[in-house]
Amino acid sequence: MDKIHLYDKILSPMVTEKTTNLSEQNKIVFKVPRAANKTNLKKNIEKIFKVNVTKINIINKQNRTKVARGKKVNVQGYKKAIITLKKGQSIDLTSGI
């Protein structure tokens, strides 16, 4: 499989206070396309980063409406994946993908 197709399944890493705390438990959080599923994500992450994935949890964030300057604006939803790595392994997100 071509490297470009592998990277299509991972949009970006999510770096927040909560995800930073999860990284201490060998968990990494990525924003993924809505069409992504657990089996494809596991294969792609293991090929790209050369780590062993033990578990994947997927959270689907729905579209929501927000008011901006008196007008209703739709904010597009997204899907995020929480990936649990084998103990002792990690992914360095600061080096760039």
Curated annotation (Swiss-Prot):
Task: Name the Gene3D superfamilies on file.
Answer: 3.30.70.330
Membrane-spanning ranges: none
Q: Name one GO cellular component term.
A: ribosome
Q: Name one GO molecular function term.
A: structural constituent of ribosome
InterPro entries to which the protein is assigned, alphabetical: Nucleotide-bd_a/b_plait_sf, Ribosomal_uL23-like, Ribosomal_uL23/eL15/eS24_sf, Ribosomal_uL23_CS
Entry-linked NCBIfam families? PRK05738.2-4
Family the UniProt entry places it in: Belongs to the universal ribosomal protein uL23 family.
Question: What protein name applies here?
Answer: Large ribosomal subunit protein uL23
Which organism encodes this protein? Answer: Pelagibacter ubique (strain HTCC1062)
